Amino acid sequence: MIGFVISLILAISSLLLGIALIFRKVKPNHFYGFRVSKFVFKSDDIWYEVNAKGGMHLIIIGGILMIIASLALVYINDNILQGIFVFITLLILALGLILSLIITYNLSHILAKEKGLK
């Protein structure tokens, strides 16, 4: 049961956080969004582009976690598999966020260079 619950909560959280970023509803701030370099605060265009890309990554991560939650639901009575689902969920979340941070960091520098900020 724990694998299902954790996967589902993290999947829904990732999806909801990503949706707001994709639709560019989050204004530049220091609390919510991909603040990967100083350049995201120097231009609203860079902020929205980087956060839209990061939001897409969160949607993809959330979709993968939703699949894991579905599998965990099928095996809800197997405690060993539930533990494995928790591990897989946390591993995918961590790796996905690390990759997303690397990609959005590079994107912020590319956009800053294009705008003459770098």
Predicted regions and their residues:
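Short membrane-interface loop/juxtamembrane segments of multi-pass integral membrane proteins
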Residues: 37-54
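Membrane-water interface of transmembrane alpha-helices
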Residues: 16-34, 102-110
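Alpha-helical transmembrane segments and their immediate juxtamembrane interface regions
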Residues: 81-118
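Juxtamembrane "helix exit" motif at the C-terminal ends of alpha-helical transmembrane segments
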Residues: 65-80
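Select subsegments of transmembrane alpha-helices in polytopic membrane proteins
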Residues: 51-65
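Membrane-embedded alpha-helical segments of multi-pass transporters/permeases
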Residues: 19, 70, 74, 98-102
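Membrane-interface helix-boundary signature
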Residues: 3, 7, 51-54, 79-86
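Alpha-helical transmembrane segments
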Residues: 2-19, 86-97
